[in-house]
Amino acid sequence: MTNRIPIASPVRTAAIVNRYFVHAKKNLGQNFLVDLDAVQGIVRAAGIEPGDQVVEVGPGIGSLTEQLLLAGGKVAAYEVDQSLPEILANELPEKVDGQDLDQRFKLIMKDVLKADFATDLAGFFDLSKPVKVVANLPYYITTPIIFNLLESSLDFTSLTLMMQKEVAERLAAQPGSKAYGPLSIAVQTQMSVDLALEVGHASFMPQPKVDSAVVVLTPLEKPADVGDRKQFNRVVKLCFAQRRKTLANNLKTLLPDKEDREKLLADLDLDPRQRPEQLAISDFIRISQAIAEMNK
C-alpha cells in the first residue's frame, strides 16, 4: 500500500502499532523512530545517493528503511524480530522509482552478528562494489555489532550508526577525556569518527531514558599498524583495567616483573605515573609492539 504520511511520524507509527498489535520489545532494544527530521538527517549523514547499496541493521517497522529507499538506495536489511516481515511488506511502498519493492529491498531474517555477507547479499547486490551500512542500533548490543562489522569481510565505504549518545562520545573521545578508552582506540586506529547529529529521546516511541547520536565511521586510507590486532586490543583493555591506577600498575598483568615494566616504560620514554587516558593512541601501539617483542 502507498501512504503519504511517513512511517517516521507519531501518527503513522501509532497506526501501525494498533493495526498489527506490535510493540517495541525491550529484550531486542527496540524503540521506534517517530521524528522524520532525525531520520532524514541520518540519510543525509550517510550520503545516500541513487544506486547506493545499503546494508541496514534492525529496520524495525521501516521508519529509516522507507527514507533510505526514497533517497535512491537499494536496501538489504538484517532483522531478528519475526513479527516484522509482514509489517515491512505491507507498509513500505509497493513501488520505488517505478521499481517493485522486491527489486529494491531484501529482508534477511538473521542476527547480523551471524551474517555471512557474501552469501546473504549474493544475487541482490553487486558484490564487486562497496556498500554503505546504516543502522539504528539497539543500545545493548552496539559495541559487538561495531566490532563485528569492522572485522567482517564486508566491503563498505562508511558506517552511519545511531547509538546511545554516551557510546558515540566514547567512539570520538580524545586522550585526556573521561570517555577515552579501549573502544575509542580500537575504532580510531581503523576509522575516522564524525559525530553527525544528536537525536533526543523524544524522537522515539516509546521514549528511552537517554539521548542518542549519529556517528559516521569512515575507513582510514592508512589504518594504524598495530600488529596483531587481538593482542593490541588485549593490551589496551588491560591498560584501562583500572582507570584510576597508573600505567605501571595496570601493566602488572602483562608484565608481572617490576624490572621488566620499568625497563619497557623507560625505553619508550613513558612516565610510569601516567594514567591510561593520558596516553596517545601511538603510545599504546608502541607498548603493544614492545611487549610482543619481549614475549618472542
From Swiss-Prot:
Stored InterPro entries: KsgA/Erm, rRNA_Ade_diMease-like_C, rRNA_Ade_Mease_Trfase_CS, rRNA_Ade_methylase_Trfase_N, rRNA_adenine_dimethylase, SAM-dependent_MTases_sf
Pfam family, one: RrnaAD
Catalysed transformations (reactions): adenosine(1518)/adenosine(1519) in 16S rRNA + 4 S-adenosyl-L-methionine = N(6)-dimethyladenosine(1518)/N(6)-dimethyladenosine(1519) in 16S rRNA + 4 S-adenosyl-L-homocysteine + 4 H(+)
SUPFAM superfamilies: S-adenosyl-L-methionine-dependent methyltransferases
Keywords, in A-Z order: Cytoplasm, Methyltransferase, RNA-binding, rRNA processing, S-adenosyl-L-methionine, Transferase
Principal localisation: cytoplasm
E.C. number: 2.1.1.182
Cystine connections: none
Molecular functions per Gene Ontology: 16S rRNA (adenine(1518)-N(6)/adenine(1519)-N(6))-dimethyltransferase activity; RNA binding
Binding site for S-adenosyl-L-methionine: N31, L33, G58, E79, D111, N136
PROSITE patterns in the record: RRNA_A_DIMETH, SAM_RNA_A_N6_MT
GO CC terms: cytosol
Class of this enzyme: transferase
Compartments (UniProt record): Cytoplasm
Annotated HAMAP family: 16SrRNA_methyltr_A (MF_00607)
Record family assignment: Belongs to the class I-like SAM-binding methyltransferase superfamily. rRNA adenine N(6)-methyltransferase family. RsmA subfamily.
Functional description taken from the UniProt entry: Specifically dimethylates two adjacent adenosines (A1518 and A1519) in the loop of a conserved hairpin near the 3'-end of 16S rRNA in the 30S particle. May play a critical role in biogenesis of 30S subunits.
Name of the protein described by the UniProt record: Ribosomal RNA small subunit methyltransferase A
Taxonomic classification: Bacteria, Bacillati, Bacillota, Bacilli, Lactobacillales
